[in-house]
Amino acid sequence: MQKISKQLSAVISPFIFSACVSQSTIQDFNQQSAAKARVELALGYLQQNNPQLAKINLDKALQHDKDYYLVHSGLAHYYQQQGEIENAHREYEIALKLNNQQGDLHNNFGTFLCRQKQFEQAQQQFQLALNSPNYYHQADTFENMALCAYSAKKMDIYQQALQKLRQTDSKRAEKFNTFK
């Protein structure tokens, strides 16, 4: 009887352990990580000029985590590239409601607003980007501020942003020497 019990244990034990592993794997699945991976795939497809596959991945990202700012930021970028300005604007606003501490998000929204000739709102977003915690792309924002101010013919803001860009990244600021 003991021999049968040991043999039965030897046969059943692997199944019990594999069931535990399977259970753990399912529980460890992180919806936000899956959403982020889908957004990254979508951005890659956009770079390859494949908006259909980009949208499919963004929709799947939304299914994984509809409350993740990065999904809505990705959708905003998608709509922006497709020329769907109202949808892009809405998605930027949703992303900011979900997480307004992301400097890259403020910077991207500022760039979007500048392209829509909403210069004052764009400058506000750039300023919010610069004031965001743990934001390390100041040179990008100063460059965008300068370009936007130049487009709006706001030369005082342009000069201020350019000066900050020189202090942050002098090589990047050099390309503005052709602007007069």
Model region roles, listed by residue range:
Residues 14-36:
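Bacterial Sec signal peptide processing site at the extreme N-terminus
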Residues 30, 64, 98, 132-134, ...:
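Structural marker of alpha-solenoid helical repeat scaffolds
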Residues 34-35, 69-70, 103-104, 137-139, ...:
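Helix-start (N-cap) detector for alpha-helical repeat units in TPR-like alpha-solenoids
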Residues 40, 74, 108, 144, ...:
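Canonical tetratricopeptide repeat
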Residues 61, 94-95, 128-131, 164-165:
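Canonical positions in the second alpha-helix
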